[in-house]
């Protein structure tokens, strides 16, 4: 009898929304929970349902990122990164410390996305390049009169020269990883 009763509740449980948001919960708390405490696959379910609709779910994906010729699955990480930047900006709390946390979460999401990739060295290498790129250009980039990015107004502890050096080192290491993965037959030669 009990089994039949609980079995009849199963369709209702499966049809329930992925997340029930208390309408009294501040947007800032929801944003932080979705960014820093929610597994990426669960975040993507919330994003698909735009739950709650009071948050900014828009994303341009990885459009400003470096080339991804092997199609590493970074799009979900880029979507959550955009969610973080856009909502923190809308909530007027986008500053160097929060930006660092959002960027670090982006890096961790990319590493998670590499889990099922056979060319793990190259996937991790490109994650390093993307992370260095957002640290250098993300959020606070300054532009000259022609619209070109000239520097990044970042945390004073991160000089533009250091960020550029980290970016180019990551790029070099990525190219080395690609060559190694190609030699091992894990990536095609382009």
UniProtKB/Swiss-Prot annotation:
Higher taxonomy: Eukaryota, Fungi, Dikarya, Ascomycota, Pezizomycotina
Protein keywords: Calcium, Disulfide bond, Hydrolase, Lipid degradation, Lipid droplet, Lipid metabolism, Metal-binding, Secreted, Signal, Virulence
Enzyme class: hydrolase
UniProt-recorded name of the protein: Secretory phospholipase A2
GO biological process per UniProt: arachidonate secretion; lipid catabolic process; phospholipid metabolic process
Cofactors: Ca(2+)
Disulfide bond positions: 62-78
Entry keyword Oxidoreductase: no
Gene that specifies this protein: PLA2
Cellular localization per UniProt: Lipid droplet; Secreted
Reactions mediated catalytically: a 1,2-diacyl-sn-glycero-3-phosphocholine + H2O = a 1-acyl-sn-glycero-3-phosphocholine + a fatty acid + H(+)
Listed EC numbers: 3.1.1.4
Cited InterPro entries: PLipase_A2_dom_sf, PLipase_A2_prok/fun
Residue numbers annotated as active site: 81
Temperature characteristics of this protein: Optimum temperature is 35 degrees Celsius.
Cofactor note: Binds 1 Ca(2+) ion per subunit.
Function statement: Secretory phospholipase that catalyzes the calcium-dependent hydrolysis of the 2-acyl groups in 3-sn-phosphoglycerides. Increases the ability to utilize insect-derived nutrients and lipids, and promotes lipid dropplets accumulation. Plays a role in virulence, including more efficient penetration of the insect cuticle and evasion of host immune response by repressing the expression of host immunity genes.
A GO cellular component annotation in the UniProt record: lipid droplet
